[in-house]
Amino acid sequence: MRSYLILRLAGPMQAWGQPTFEGTRPTGRFPTRSGLLGLLGACLGIQRDDTSSLQALSESVQFAVRCDELILDDRRVSVTGLRDYHTVLGAREDYRGLKSHETIQTWREYLCDASFTVALWLTPHATMVISELEKAVLKPRYTPYLGRRSCPLTHPLFLGTCQASDPQKALLNYEPVGGDIYSEESVTGHHLKFTARDEPMITLPRQFASREWYVIKGGMDVSQ
């Protein structure tokens, strides 16, 4: 059995960044590893330039994310996408090299009315304990948000802690069950999997390495 910290990520808008170039800022369908690490880092009060603490956090935790169905007034609310348009004056120098003028255009994507349940557990190399993370989530040092500062939470982050043999069973303790699960750990070794570039390279800002997510469709095993 292993200890799990369970989080709820819900809000009117969320944005979980994907690889991008120039002005288009897409969002993933569920929270990325880099986004979840950033959220935890904010709760713990870790500064962006504190690379040793960020590296320790990254090496200490793994995640499984369940995509939940949102019900309001007994009605199912479908997740939709939103794209907004910005112009930016005085952008970073690396962007200016891509443009013929100082003002750049950006299109930013968001998920609307999405809700996720996240199971977090410690790796064998962890330098922190679940109770430390629980305390930080209950009383964050910096304001947590859902991928971007314009995306506040509408539900407390903390759902609970539990003991379970794997992340799938940990998530079964919290309603609503049945949504697709994306896990950093394969439960049976027979899941579908895909590669995502969402592992932050701590010493190289805004650079990401590739890693794998395992898919449990509808909360059930999916063989390859």
Curated annotation (Swiss-Prot):
GO CC annotation: protein-containing complex
Protein name: CRISPR system Cascade subunit CasD
Keyword Secreted: no
GO MF annotation list: DNA/RNA hybrid binding; RNA binding
Summary of the knockout phenotype: Loss of resistance to bacteriophage lambda infection, loss of plasmid silencing. Decreased levels of crRNA.
Record's keyword terms, sorted: Antiviral defense
Induction, per UniProt: Repressed by H-NS, activated by LeuO. Activated by the BaeSR two-component regulatory system, possibly due to envelope stress. Part of the casABCDE-ygbT-ygbF operon.
Functional note: CRISPR (clustered regularly interspaced short palindromic repeat), is an adaptive immune system that provides protection against mobile genetic elements (viruses, transposable elements and conjugative plasmids). CRISPR clusters contain sequences complementary to antecedent mobile elements and target invading nucleic acids. CRISPR clusters are transcribed and processed into CRISPR RNA (crRNA). A component of Cascade, which participates in CRISPR interference, the third stage of CRISPR immunity. Cascade binds both crRNA and in a sequence-specific manner negatively supercoiled dsDNA target. This leads to the formation of an R-loop in which the crRNA binds the target DNA, displacing the noncomplementary strand. Cas3 is recruited to Cascade, nicks target DNA and then unwinds and cleaves the target, leading to DNA degradation and invader neutralization. CasCDE alone is also able to form R-loops.
Family classification: Belongs to the CRISPR-associated protein Cas5 family. Subtype I-E/Ecoli subfamily.
InterPro entries: CRISPR-assoc_prot_Cas5, CRISPR-assoc_prot_Cas5_N, CRISPR-assoc_prot_CasD
Subunit structure: Part of the Cascade ribonucleoprotein complex, with stoichiometry CasA(1),CasB(2),CasC(6),CasD(1),CasE(1)-crRNA(1). Interacts directly with CasA and CasC. Stable subcomplexes of CasBCDE-crRNA and CasCDE-crRNA also form, both of which are able to bind target dsDNA, and at least CasCDE is able to form R-loops. CasCDE and CasCE complexes have endonuclease activity. Binding of target ssRNA or dsDNA causes a conformational change in the Cascade complex.
Claim: Metal-binding is one of the keywords in the record: no
Biological processes per GO annotation: CRISPR-cas system; defense response to virus; maintenance of CRISPR repeat elements
Pfam families noted in UniProt: Cas_Cas5d
